[in-house]
């Protein structure tokens, strides 16, 4: 370890606790959290010997203690070992890799030192924002590059200093092949939502991309599901990866799942009833096609509710604006296609509605994971037609989960934040 690296690591147990007093901490989240994020061994962020500036960013982001995937992953990632990690959606996977990636970057070296690849533009923007917030006390330059934006802007930014790149595969490969994104110092590669990145959609791109990286590199894969393609990728590009599997149950413990049998023509009426009866903070409503997304959004507006819609055929700047405004809470309901099933973290979403039931278990798992984020509670409601009945049972069996008939009244304690508050006195005795 070099002298510069040694100076970066400041053990937090050095007796000087005064630095914490000056932190600008957000309000403490007193909502109930499930074992998906609380079932840990009691490790603290300080125990990883992270630099103080990074610790300040972690605490000021409101992250108090590592979740199970962070606890299992951060220490190993800091050693430089390859990682293959399976954990549920919404349990802190992004922090599990962002923290060690940022810690290992040397700001004095004005070159790309780490790259995070994600499958969608929205996830790239979200991940880059997290990295910026975590590293706000460090002189770190984070760049996000995705398709659908001006290539010339990316080229100009790469002419300056960039330490960490968050990218979708096609765009960053294009920049590498043009000789603009120079990767000789990029010794860390993270694939987030790795199952999607290793699917047919991106076939061949990752192999070409990895050829631009140094031979001595660290590769980390994070996902909720790992298809067979992961095995061949692992054998080809990874060296004795450390395997983490926190997937004994596939669905989030905090998401209660219901179904309602309806005829196709009754779906909008049923949705209207749900809007009236449920205490929705924010909801995401999934359809199986972009055309149905637009039609449903129009219907929802006609029956008197505000809603946004988003799908993959919209212009990128329009998608960005809708996504940003929904995150800010400017609208209660968002109708979308499966574009938004992966990694998107909007903590205010407490209800997910499958207006159209998904065709496979993997899509179902990712959709319902948009509620119940980071151990909080939420509900997923599935509108099931006669044709969907066999798919419903098959998905239940594949995910080893139970989807119950929806009761006349859904208990607010299952999904309403105000009903989930943990009393401060209870917390001290817990």
Swiss-Prot record:
A motif (Q motif) lies at residues 43-71. Keywords: Apoptosis, ATP-binding, Cytoplasm, Developmental protein, Differentiation, Helicase, Hydrolase, Nucleotide-binding, Oogenesis, RNA-binding, Spermatogenesis. It catalyses: ATP + H2O = ADP + phosphate + H(+). InterPro entries: DEAD/DEAH_box_helicase_dom, Helicase_ATP-bd, Helicase_C-like, P-loop_NTPase, RNA-helicase_DEAD-box_CS, RNA_helicase_DEAD_Q_motif. One of its GO terms (molecular function) is ATP binding. It is an enzyme of class 3 (hydrolase). GO terms for biological process: apoptotic process; determination of adult lifespan; gamete generation; mRNA metabolic process; negative regulation of apoptotic process; negative regulation of translation; oogenesis; P-body assembly. Expression is restricted to two germline precursors Z2 and Z3 in L1 stage hermaphrodites, and is detectable specifically in the gonad at low levels into the L3 stage. Expression is significantly higher during the early L4 stage. In adults, expression remains gonad-specific and was not apparent in the somatically derived uterus. Expressed in germ granules (P granules); when associated with pgl-1. A motif (DEAD box) lies at residues 192-195. Residues 254-414 form the Helicase C-terminal domain. One of its GO terms (cellular component) is ribonucleoprotein granule. PANTHER family: DEAD-BOX ATP-DEPENDENT RNA HELICASE 50. Belongs to the DEAD box helicase family. DDX6/DHH1 subfamily. This is ATP-dependent RNA helicase cgh-1. The gene is cgh-1.
